[in-house]
From Swiss-Prot:
<keyword id="KW-0460">Magnesium</keyword>
<feature type="binding site">
    <location>
        <position position="14"/>
    </location>
    <ligand>
        <name>Mg(2+)</name>
    </ligand>
</feature>
<comment type="subunit">
    <text>Monomer.</text>
</comment>
<dbReference type="GO" id="GO:0005737">
    <property type="term" value="C:cytoplasm"/>
</dbReference>
<keyword id="KW-0486">Methionine biosynthesis</keyword>
<feature type="binding site">
    <location>
        <position position="16"/>
    </location>
    <ligand>
        <name>Mg(2+)</name>
    </ligand>
</feature>
<dbReference type="GO" id="GO:0019509">
    <property type="term" value="P:L-methionine salvage from methylthioadenosine"/>
</dbReference>
<dbReference type="Pfam" id="PF00702">
    <property type="entry name" value="Hydrolase"/>
</dbReference>
<feature type="binding site">
    <location>
        <position position="202"/>
    </location>
    <ligand>
        <name>Mg(2+)</name>
    </ligand>
</feature>
<dbReference type="GO" id="GO:0000287">
    <property type="term" value="F:magnesium ion binding"/>
</dbReference>
<dbReference type="InterPro" id="IPR006439">
    <property type="entry name" value="HAD-SF_hydro_IA"/>
</dbReference>
<feature type="binding site">
    <location>
        <begin position="143"/>
        <end position="144"/>
    </location>
    <ligand>
        <name>substrate</name>
    </ligand>
</feature>
<keyword id="KW-0539">Nucleus</keyword>
<dbReference type="InterPro" id="IPR036412">
    <property type="entry name" value="HAD-like_sf"/>
</dbReference>
<keyword id="KW-0028">Amino-acid biosynthesis</keyword>
<dbReference type="InterPro" id="IPR023943">
    <property type="entry name" value="Enolase-ppase_E1"/>
</dbReference>
<dbReference type="GO" id="GO:0005634">
    <property type="term" value="C:nucleus"/>
</dbReference>
Length: 252
């Protein structure tokens, strides 16, 4: 379906590689969390019940046993040093573990609130958000980053607060992004027919999962995104940015 004739009720956007550059996530956000996790844990270890819960959840993921097995001396107790090392281990391996995402979100929140961090969005994003809202569409976000972290990127973006444009946020609590059931869950949560949801992503596996659940999909080819194979280009609709989607309309 040509983008100029496309209709939808909800635009579901990915963040990394779609609204926001991959380099911002990998070269700014991840190192910030890695560099500040020890300080954050030291300040909140005793006082924050939320952090205590995250620490418990981190110890329950399969990778925790793998990590402790790599240590020269097995830890006698779980302390700041052990969890700091494990968090850095997960970040280095780019493992999308839910309690890690929650912890990163708390660390990033401090950075955004102090002005050390500002969320990157591509230049075409604000105009597209405005056009879709004016046309009566809802905008939702689905990212592997925690809902809290998603909101921070848009609230403290380089162009100001974009959070008011967004109606709903989904993270891995709804399911993994390359599983069809996740998108069925999202459609159910939104109360929409899957065919009325347009999902924008940079990952072919995510697009395939969404299509199998009945969603419309388009793949973004942003600067810095992983190049697509010829087969992936052939089997997906591709756009370079959001500019061709300004004419999105509600179904009649």
């Amino acid at each position: 379906m040509p983008t100029t004739e496309r209709v939808a009720k909800v635009v579901l956007v990915d963040i990394e590689g779609t609204t926001t550059s991959i380099s911002f996530v990998h070269d700014v956000l991840f190192p910030y969390a890695k560099n500040n996790v020890k300080k954050f844990l030291e300040e909140s270890w005793e006082s924050s019940s939320e952090v205590k819960q995250i620490v418990r959840e981190l110890q329950q993921v399969p990778q925790y046993a793998e990590y402790t097995a790599t240590l020269r001396v097995p830890p006698k107790e779980v302390d700041v040093q052990v969890i700091t090392g494990f968090v850095r281990y997960l970040i280095d391996k780019d493992l999308k573990v839910t309690p890690l995402k929650t912890l990163q979100g708390l660390i990033w929140q401090q950075g955004y609130e102090t002005g050390e961090l500002m969320g990157h969005v591509f230049n075409d994003v604000p105009g597209a958000f405005e056009a879709w809202r004016e046309a009566g569409l809802r905008i939702a976000v689905y990212s592997s980053g925690s809902v809290a972290a998603q909101k921070l990127i848009f609230k403290y973006s380089i162009v100001g607060d974009l959070l008011t444009h967004l109606s709903t946020h989904f993270d891995t609590h709804v399911g993994h992004k390359q599983e069809s059931q996740s998108y069925a869950n999202i459609a159910q949560s939104l109360g929409e027919d899957p065919s009325h949801i347009l999902f924008l992503t940079d990952i072919p596996g995510e697009a395939a999962a969404a299509r199998s659940a009945g969603l419309q999909t388009i793949i973004l080819q942003r600067p810095g995104n992983t190049p697509l194979t010829d087969d992936q280009k052939y089997s997906n609709e591709l756009i370079a940015d959001f500019s061709s989607l300004h004419t999105l309309q509600l179904p009649e």
